[in-house]
Regions:
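Short, glycine-/small-residue-enriched flexible loop/hinge segments at domain edges that mediate gating
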Residues: 44, 78-89, 101
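Short, active-site-adjacent cap segments at secondary-structure transitions
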Residues: 89-93, 148-149, 478-479
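Amphipathic alpha-helical interaction surfaces in cytosolic regulatory modules
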Residues: 88-102, 129
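Gly/Ser-rich catalytic serine loop of serine hydrolases
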Residues: 141-151
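N-terminal glycine-rich phosphate-binding loop for ADP-containing cofactors
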Residues: 2-36, 58, 66, 70, ...
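STAS-typified acidic loop motif
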Residues: 34-61, 88
Length: 718
């Protein structure tokens, strides 16, 4: 097949000097009498699973060459089918985006040429992948491992698909990064499984902490036609393919496959498509408030897919992908993605891993909601005994009961087996006596946020644990060093600050107090890795990173309300950023009393940069937990509390003031050595506060907009 003429447009191998080429390696498999020979293409870049297969230009051309040979052999009657699978544990992780971005916008490339190059990459992907569905023989995708973006699109172009039940990740993460599924995904997936299910993968999951599916969930959605266990996945997939080829196994497809009208061949009715698209548009608006173009472009592609021909759908994807490959959104997204992937592997300031102590039993002081969430995470991830304590048996029973109930939920949803549920329940126990911590290796407190209370807790725990037990605090703002006053071994106390909800947010701030030794920090980091959390080491300064930055941001906005800015103006001033929630929804999540406590702590430490809002105090003292009623209408009693003032600001003035406050505070934090570098601030805000990927990190955003230079006289990255 002749691929599009992209000579002179498509970046050459010289433009992709770092491309790790994914080769298409072909071998024949005899499927037996009546089925014939299947030409099995294995995608393999020559590395193990820690370096996934990706598609750059040379990788695409390697697959194209394999398909040239397969097409010729099929025409000659030598093969009855073509199969595609990947190296162990990996099908493919999509396009080589770093290489593509560098090649498209490299030195000396003018804007017109850059777009032509981007269009060339988009067109090449379509031209190669679509051949899998246009061969003279059926094609089979055997999804043996991770399939992300272009990796999933390879499978969608095939006639049939099998999937391993052990696949850990299958997804379209493009909108998370600032792109669209541009090699067939936005057209093919909704036509296969219906618009509502497709939009969950294409838009909802990427904008929800980049959620991934596992193999069974993908099979349930209809992405694959059959599912097999990983131990004999390829053998069973080949056996199934032989049954399909001989007619012993039939696979139904949605719509009327032979109809001339594209709409008649697609899954779902016109009404179902309209409803799904409308719901997705509302969802996007609530998530990004118009600030990120990629999800809107993806939605437009899906909306058009029902009636568009394949050529029309793919051409629209080419156009969208070319535009977005050149966007600031993608560059920001790639910065954030690289930061999360690379900097979390070895946190700045991390001591030698060999200093970490083994953890075979965990203690949790407290049995409230936060403590119970922490205990549940330890049970699930560490699979070691966890004991909770509290002041009375009723509280202990409630905490243990919460853990049991959450395990039962996992069991009812089929996510764990009955045996696993029983094992996990057996690991969690409770006691009113701290003697239960005597043989614990790691004890974390999650009690009331008051220094005297936490000091008392640590004094009681230290009296019963062994000398090597690490004592951790989940404090969100208090001094770790101050908590160690009077302890015999302050060197083993470390901050271990989770974010709420514990199971969802991936960040843990590991706080080094003035006496904390390397063994305690190394153990905390090792535990964080076992919990599948990303750790950042921070200095023992009030509120650490995320809460300090958020409190300054929220404080600047609430101060404008004190001055007379109407609630609606202040609440929506930051909408252009596309933050995960508005300021007063954030206040609701944190709780006015906790927000007031953190603000007072920071005011005591840093003065009027963190002025305590009289209206925040009034809200906290009123007992109201939110500005909003349960139906999300505004509570008129709260609005009355927030009224007054004579110097209102506009939305743009509120946003400018809040961002300038952030620029000032982050510069001060870096000067204080709260973290090692601006990248650590960025990482904390992305992982702990949901700072949007489409903005990149917070410090490059403040540089890009000129706010950092305006406020501080210098950019964060000179």
């Amino acid at each position: 097949m002749n691929i599009p003429n992209v000579s002179g447009i498509l970046p050459s191998a010289d433009d992709f000097p770092g491309e790790v080429v994914t080769r298409a390696i072909v071998r024949d498999v005899d499927l037996g009498p009546g089925a014939g020979v299947l030409a099995l293409i294995t995608l393999d870049n020559g590395h193990d699973h820690t370096k996934p297969n990706t598609f750059g230009p040379q990788g695409l051309l390697s697959l194209n060459a394999a398909l040239d040979a397969a097409e010729a052999r099929a025409a000659a009657g030598e093969i009855a089918a073509v199969g595609v699978t990947g190296k162990p544990f990996i099908l493919a992780a999509g396009a080589d985006l770093d290489g593509a971005a560098a090649a498209i916008t490299g030195a000396g490339v003018d804007p017109e040429e850059a777009r032509e190059r981007a269009l060339g990459i988009a067109s090449l992907g379509h031209a190669v992948f679509r051949r899998l569905g246009e061969l003279p023989v059926p094609s089979f995708a055997f999804i043996n491992g991770v399939a992300l973006g272009g990796g999933l699109e390879v499978a969608l172009h095939c006639t049939y698909r099998t999937i391993s039940s052990g696949v850990p990740m299958i997804a379209f993460p493009e909108c998370f990064l600032g792109l669209v599924p541009g090699w067939g995904g936005a057209y093919l997936l909704p036509r296969l499984i219906g618009p509502a299910r497709a939009l969950k993968l294409i838009i909802e999951n990427p904008l929800s902490q980049n959620k991934m599916l596992r193999g069974p969930a993908a099979f349930e959605l209809g992405i694959a036609d059959a599912m097999f266990e990983p131990a004999d996945f390829l053998e069973e997939s080949l056996r199934w393919a032989s049954l399909v080829l001989t007619g012993a196994e039939t696979v139904s497809r949605p719509g009327r496959p032979d109809a001339a009208d594209p709409a008649a061949r697609a899954a779902g009715t016109e009404e179902e498509w309209a409803q799904a698209v409308a719901a997705a548009r509302l969802f996007i608006g609530g998530k990004v408030h118009g600030a990120a173009p990629a999800p809107y472009r993806a939605l437009d592609l899906v909306a058009a897919a029902r009636t568009a021909s394949r050529d029309e759908g793919f051409a629209a994807e080419d156009d969208a992908l070319a535009d977005l490959l050149l966007s600031e959104e993608l560059r920001a997204g790639l910065y954030a993605f690289d930061l999360v992937q690379k900097r979390t592997r070895r946190p700045a300031g991390a001591p030698d891993k060999s200093l970490a102590r083994p953890v075979t039993k965990v203690g949790v002081v407290g049995a409230g909601l936060m403590a119970a969430q922490i205990a549940l995470l330890f049970v699930r991830r560490l699979q070691v005994p966890v004991v909770m304590t509290d002041l009375d048996q009723a509280r202990v029973d409630a905490g243990v009961g919460y853990v049991h109930a959450e395990i039962d939920k996992q069991l009812s949803r089929g996510r764990i087996s009955p045996d696993a549920a029983n094992r996990q329940k057996a690991l969690i126990t409770g006691s009113v006596a701290k003697d239960a911590f005597a043989d614990a290796d790691f004890v974390i407190e999650a009690v009331f946020e008051e220094l005297a209370v936490k000091r008392q807790v640590f004094a009681e725990v230290e009296a019963v644990v062994n000398e090597t037990c690490v004592l951790a605090t989940n404090t969100s703002s208090l001094s770790v060093t101050a908590m160690t006053s009077g302890l015999a071994h302050p060197e083993r106390v470390v901050g271990f600050h989770f974010f709420n909800p514990v199971a969802v947010l991936p960040l843990v701030e590991v706080v080094r107090g003035s006496s904390t030794d390397d063994a305690a920090v190394a153990t905390a980091l090792a535990v964080g890795r076992q919990l599948k959390k990303n750790c950042v080491i921070v200095a023992d300064r009030p509120a650490f990173v995320v809460n300090r930055v958020l409190t300054r941001f929220l404080g600047e906005i609430t101060r404008t309300v004190d001055e007379g800015t109407p609630f609606e103006v202040a609440e929506h001033a930051a909408d252009p950023l596309g933050l995960p929630m508005t300021p007063f929804l954030l206040l609701q999540l944190v709780g006015p009393r906790i927000a007031l406590h953190v603000a007072e702590t920071l005011h005591d430490a840093f003065g009027d940069r963190f002025a305590v809002s009289p209206k925040l105090r009034a809200l906290a003292e009123s007992g109201k937990s939110s500005v909003y009623l349960p139906d999300f209408s505004v509570d008129p009693e709260v609005i009355e509390l927030l009224g007054g003032g004579s110097a209102p600001s506009t939305e743009s003035e509120v946003l400018e003031r809040a961002l300038e406050g952030l620029a000032q505070e982050i510069k001060i934090m870096l000067d204080e050595g709260v973290v090692a570098a601006p990248e650590d601030i960025d990482l904390c805000m992305i992982l702990g506060a949901g700072w949007p990927f489409h903005l990149g990190g917070i410090t490059p955003y403040l540089d890009r907009t000129g706010i950092a230079a305006k406020v501080n006289g210098v950019a964060f990255r000179g």
